[in-house]
């Protein structure tokens, strides 16, 4: 029977000093016999996805205490990728994932907490906390701050000129801002309307993708990924999480039940999470994060597994940025993540014998929460929770209900296998002589006309250079824009390339160009945008051998990407590059801090999840 970790600092005469300090935090005599549960919050006023979390940690804490536990809250950092985008601030985004994981480990182990509730939301915070959860392997429940409501405004149709109500998100503001066909007044209106409420950005971007994946991993409650941040129903998720974590903690320490530990989810749950991601056309960043989380869990889940799944899993859901028709609030109306998992189950694409934090198995969860099969009217009412359309930074501030559910599995937001958007899913892994260890593309955002594309290399050696060339019309139709030395080591920090892809789209080249990088993309990216090219240029990857004018062939159906240069020529170029060193041809005006240099020393390429190479720490 495992011993409560907290007893290390609360039991025995020799811990009198520690207990004295615990008492100074408000603990009483009878509290020392209770489990100590960490409430891991990520409140910050810098990030709209986290601006409303300040009081929610204490909301969870009160429920923990009412259920018989002791709650102790602390905070992690949180970087807003959208605000950090397009300047050197983005160098810090991916490294912050590891800082978050480390900070959770430090706090929980230093204070011997028995379990934790992780309150996350945006891009690197959920993955960082998931990495920590797997590393610590103590009972945990995730509850996110929830998605933002989609924005709305009235704009003239660029073709018909008729005034239309248009749903908006962050990416629309970026694209329209550099489109000369829109007036300054229209750009200002979109800017003010695109992000109307607190919450994670409203499309199937990285933050929402990861919060949805926690449901598939079995580590959060149904609705975690899809109930909008402003809706009163989300308050119940926080309260239930607080009560449930006490039950899970007792199951582990008092009943020796290892099924409640995060590592118990196993390989099958990682397959389920990736299957969901492919089916819903999630962010390519989720691949990076799942690989990293699997490494922390000690699970051998690799790019080969992702490639295998991408060939057999259908795309059942298409949401912004892959379409303007649907946002996360529409996914919820169609039954949320449990509905997508239900359709995958009926298609024979899911492992349902894995545990969740709220049911003994995923099968039990689907029986209760899949709106196609449930008999529970309360569940149906839950999935009618909708947006109010009122700008606010206040959580749980409205109780709007959709008049009906979206149960149309032929033409609705969520499709059945028979009516899938495509029989192959929304993500693909490509390999070839330019990416020996693979690269990834969100096929859900690629127009069918360019699934096979042959173009001319336009080489840039930083995101800044790529943006400058695109805006100055140096990039032409038929080009493959190469953005290299932006990987985890080469950046350092593996910047997101949302600005280059948005500007390509705004220049009318979205169906006429491709972009290939050893960096990564925002979840808001669409188009023929291929990232995570591994090995990266700074690690000797072949993307560093490409030259202006080389022909590059991309074949998504056959999962290949190649520079059309002979092996002999590539070998000659490699010898030349070895002599020069694997770095940009010209020094970049980029200030790299000591913290980023330390990160670059240990980090591996994207195909390994951009985690630290721990072998470098061996004696």
Curated annotation (Swiss-Prot):
Which terms does the record give in the GO molecular function aspect? 2 iron, 2 sulfur cluster binding; dihydroxy-acid dehydratase activity; magnesium ion binding
Q: Where does Mg(2+) bind?
A: 81, 123-124, 496
- Tell me which residues bind [2Fe-2S] cluster: 122, 201
Please give the superkingdom of this protein's source: Bacteria
Q: Which UniProt keywords apply?
A: 2Fe-2S, Amino-acid biosynthesis, Branched-chain amino acid biosynthesis, Iron, Iron-sulfur, Lyase, Magnesium, Metal-binding
Q: Which residues form the active site?
A: 522 (proton acceptor)
- Name the needed cofactors: [2Fe-2S] cluster; Mg(2+)
Gene Ontology CC terms:
cytosol
> Where does the record place the modification N6-carboxylysine?
124
Q: How is the cofactor bound?
A: Binds 1 [2Fe-2S] cluster per subunit. This cluster acts as a Lewis acid cofactor.
| EC annotation from Swiss-Prot or TrEMBL | 4.2.1.9
Listed under GO biological process in this entry are: isoleucine biosynthetic process; L-valine biosynthetic process
Q: In which pathway does it act?
A: Amino-acid biosynthesis; L-isoleucine biosynthesis; L-isoleucine from 2-oxobutanoate: step 3/4; Amino-acid biosynthesis; L-valine biosynthesis; L-valine from pyruvate: step 3/4
Q: Main role?
A: Functions in the biosynthesis of branched-chain amino acids. Catalyzes the dehydration of (2R,3R)-2,3-dihydroxy-3-methylpentanoate (2,3-dihydroxy-3-methylvalerate) into 2-oxo-3-methylpentanoate (2-oxo-3-methylvalerate) and of (2R)-2,3-dihydroxy-3-methylbutanoate (2,3-dihydroxyisovalerate) into 2-oxo-3-methylbutanoate (2-oxoisovalerate), the penultimate precursor to L-isoleucine and L-valine, respectively.
- Family of this protein: Belongs to the IlvD/Edd family.
Tell me which HAMAP family the record gives. Answer: IlvD
Q: What's the name of the protein? A: Dihydroxy-acid dehydratase 1
- Which organism encodes this protein? Burkholderia lata (strain ATCC 17760 / DSM 23089 / LMG 22485 / NCIMB 9086 / R18194 / 383)
Tell me the organism's taxonomic lineage: Bacteria, Pseudomonadati, Pseudomonadota, Betaproteobacteria, Burkholderiales
């Amino acid at each position: 029977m495992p011993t409560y970790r907290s007893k290390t600092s609360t039991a025995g005469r020799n811990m009198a000093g520690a207990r004295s300090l615990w008492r100074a935090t408000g603990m009483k005599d009878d509290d020392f016999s209770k489990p100590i549960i960490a409430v891991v919050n990520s409140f910050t006023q810098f990030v709209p996805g986290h601006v409303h979390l300040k009081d929610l940690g204490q909301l969870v804490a009160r429920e923990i205490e009412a259920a018989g536990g002791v709650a102790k809250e602390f905070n992690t950092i949180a970087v807003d990728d959208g605000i950090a985008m397009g300047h050197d601030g983005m160098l810090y985004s991916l490294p912050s994932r590891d800082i978050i994981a480390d900070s959770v480990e430090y706090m929980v182990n230093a204070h011997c907490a028995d379990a934790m509730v992780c309150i996350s939301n945006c891009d690197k915070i959920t993955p960082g906390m998931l990495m920590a959860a797997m590393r610590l392997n103590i009972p945990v429940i995730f509850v996110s701050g929830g998605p933002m409501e989609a924005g709305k405004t009235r704009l003239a149709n660029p073709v018909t000129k008729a005034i239309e109500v248009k749903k908006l998100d962050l990416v629309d503001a970026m694209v329209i801002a550099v489109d000369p066909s829109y007036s300054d007044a229209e750009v200002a209106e979109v800017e003010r309307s695109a992000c109307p409420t607190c919450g994670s950005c409203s499309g199937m971007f990285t933050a929402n993708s990861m919060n949805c994946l926690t449901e598939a991993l079995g580590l959060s409650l149904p609705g975690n990924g899809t109930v909008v941040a402003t809706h009163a129903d989300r308050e119940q998720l926080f309260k239930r999480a607080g009560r449930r974590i006490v039950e899970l903690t007792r199951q582990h320490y008092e009943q020796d039940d290892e099924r409640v530990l995060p590592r118990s989810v196993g390989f099958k749950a990682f397959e389920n999470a990736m299957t969901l991601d492919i089916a819903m056309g999630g962010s390519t960043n989720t691949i990076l994060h799942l690989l990293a989380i699997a490494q922390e869990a000690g699970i051998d889940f690799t790019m080969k597994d992702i490639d295998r799944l991408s060939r057999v899993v259908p795309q059942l859901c298409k949401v912004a940025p892959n379409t303007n028709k649907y946002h996360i609030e529409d996914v919820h109306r169609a039954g949320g993540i449990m509905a997508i998992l239900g359709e995958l189950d009926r298609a024979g694409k899911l492992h349902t014998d894995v545990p969740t934090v709220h049911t003994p198995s995923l099968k039990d969860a689907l029986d209760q929460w899949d709106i196609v099969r449930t008999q529970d009217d309360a569940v149906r009412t839950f999935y009618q929770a909708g947006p109010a359309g009122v700008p606010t930074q206040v959580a749980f501030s409205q109780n709007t209900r959709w008049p009906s559910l979206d149960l149309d599995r032929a033409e609705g937001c969520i499709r059945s296998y028979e009516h899938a958007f495509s029989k192959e899913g929304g993500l693909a892994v490509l390999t070839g002589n330019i990416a020996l260890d693979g690269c990834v593309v969100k096929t859900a955002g690629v127009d069918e006309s360019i699934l096979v594309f042959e173009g001319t290399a336009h080489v840039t050696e930083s995101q800044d250079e790529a943006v400058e060339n695109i805006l100055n019309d140096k990039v032409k139709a038929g080009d493959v824009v190469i953005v290299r030395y932006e990987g985890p080591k080469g950046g350092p920090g593996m910047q997101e390339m949302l600005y280059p892809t948005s500007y390509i789209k705004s220049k009318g080249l979205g169906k006429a160009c491709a972009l290939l990088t050893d960096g990564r993309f925002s979840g808001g990216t669409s188009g023929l945008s291929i990232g995570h090219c591994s090995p990266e240029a700074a690690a000797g990857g072949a993307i560093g051998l490409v030259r202006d004018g080389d022909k590059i062939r991309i074949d998504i159906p056959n999962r290949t990407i190649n520079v059309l240069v002979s092996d002999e020529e590539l070998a000659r170029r490699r010898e030349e590059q070895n002599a020069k060193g694997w770095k940009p041809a010209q020094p970049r005006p980029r200030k790299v801090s000591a913290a980023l240099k330390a990160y670059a020393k240990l980090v591996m390429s994207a195909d390994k999840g951009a985690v630290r190479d721990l072998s470098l720490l061996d004696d």
